[in-house]
């Protein structure tokens, strides 16, 4: 069994918990996930099964979220799961105040990940260091936000705004909530988060654990094909002899009949044989004056 499961992660489970449960349900060891979701968050968590685990790195990086930011509160984790370190009513905050600063969070921005996160500093995960009471400097990094817009607004002593955010990999919505509060000089934290899209998978087509279990009991469960998950990658088709050589690890000289733009050098491709069998992922690389199709991940023999 190999392919992808578009899992709708429930609140209260870590991404690792979800992988462990899928292993148990499918009675398979080779299972991995395509992008960590915080325990409190819900929504799309791509799960790879079997040989598909080798292809997680090739999934598209774009993600989309619905998130709620609560103002007037600062926590240790930048969400409501952490300890509240500051709480002060801000009834004077207006929607127009948020609208003025929101463009600052669009495009390529500098972001400091939350101190409670899976990022490693000197070989240790930040959340482990934070739980030990150790303070370390979290390195700033560049992330990209493609779109951010306001969905709803609720005024009050601790007002809330609902946001729709589309972003690239590595972007922490908790950090956006924290920094939005800082920009307004009132504090802010993430109150709720749902990932509605991740790596080409969408929430409307996702399955809950209950649905997976029911389908398994009724013998109706099936994984999404590898080709569906990698549909964003262009295709190269090899003749039988070339396919055999490529699957054995040989690099193949570029061929005009592949009809691939040479400017796509260094890009990844889905590689098939003439029978339509998916062979794996290849990459066009430059070697002196030549272009070569190098195997990156070989799935089929």
Curated annotation (Swiss-Prot):
Superkingdom of the organism of origin: Bacteria
Membrane spanning residue stretches: none
UniProt keyword annotations, A-Z: Isomerase, tRNA processing
Active-site residues annotated for this sequence: 38
Catalytic reactions of this protein: uridine(55) in tRNA = pseudouridine(55) in tRNA
Enzyme class label: isomerase
GO biological process annotation, one example: tRNA pseudouridine synthesis
GO molecular function, one term: tRNA pseudouridine(55) synthase activity
Disulfide bond sites: none
EC numbers: 5.4.99.25
Keyword 4Fe-4S appears in the UniProt entry: no
A matching Pfam family: TruB-C_2
Gene3D superfamilies: Pseudouridine synthase (3.30.2350.10)
UniProt similarity note: Belongs to the pseudouridine synthase TruB family. Type 1 subfamily.
HAMAP family: TruB_bact (MF_01080)
Role, per record: Responsible for synthesis of pseudouridine from uracil-55 in the psi GC loop of transfer RNAs.
UniProt-recorded name of the protein: tRNA pseudouridine synthase B
Species this chain originates from: Trichodesmium erythraeum (strain IMS101)
